[in-house]
Amino acid sequence: MALLLTMVIALTCLGGFASPSPVPPSTALKELIEELVNITQNQKAPLCNGSMVWSINLTAGVYCAALESLINVSGCSAIEKTQRMLNGFCPHKVSAGQFSSLRVRDTKIEVAQFVKDLLLHLKKLFREGQFN
């Protein structure tokens, strides 16, 4: 009985070593890039019915600004996973209608073009090793 109890305790302790750990930023960025590639390659109809989003400044705070722009697009299942992934990169909670100083508020572009621009920028960041 004592041996069985010892084994249960040992397995419980070892179970902590096998538990999932946070995804490294490089892996998360690579997964986001792959998702954006899938979106841009699998377009048969206009992405999100041609919805328009605010253009963003890609030089700083790109993840939160991109999420702020895309969060206002509703009813578009093609970008839902991208929204969730961007949410993981953004340190603060983003809600619909939120405005950022990083957004270029006078320019709206189609979601498809926004995704392509974001993809090119994220590929550049990945090549340069800028994962955060």
UniProtKB/Swiss-Prot annotation:
| A molecular function GO annotation | cytokine receptor binding
Per the record, the major location class is secreted
Q: Name one GO cellular component term.
A: extracellular space
- Give the sugar-modified residues: N38, N49, N57, N72
InterPro entries in alphabetical order: 4_helix_cytokine-like_core, IL-13, IL-4/IL-13, IL-4/IL-13_CS
Alphabetically ordered keywords of this record:
Cytokine, Disulfide bond, Glycoprotein, Secreted, Signal
A GO BP entry: immune response
Q: Which residues form the signal peptide?
A: 1-18
Q: Which domain of life is it from?
A: Eukaryota
Q: List the disulfide bonds.
A: C48-C76, C64-C90
Q: Which SUPFAM superfamilies match?
A: 4-helical cytokines (SSF47266)
Any idea where this protein resides? Secreted
- TM helices/strands, residue ranges: none
Assembly, per entry: Interacts with IL13RA2.
Protein family membership: Belongs to the IL-4/IL-13 family.
* Function, as annotated: Cytokine that plays important roles in allergic inflammation and immune response to parasite infection. Synergizes with IL2 in regulating interferon-gamma synthesis. Stimulates B-cell proliferation, and activation of eosinophils, basophils, and mast cells. Plays an important role in controlling IL33 activity by modulating the production of transmembrane and soluble forms of interleukin-1 receptor-like 1/IL1RL1.
| The protein's name | Interleukin-13
Record organism: Macaca thibetana
Q: Which gene encodes it?
A: IL13
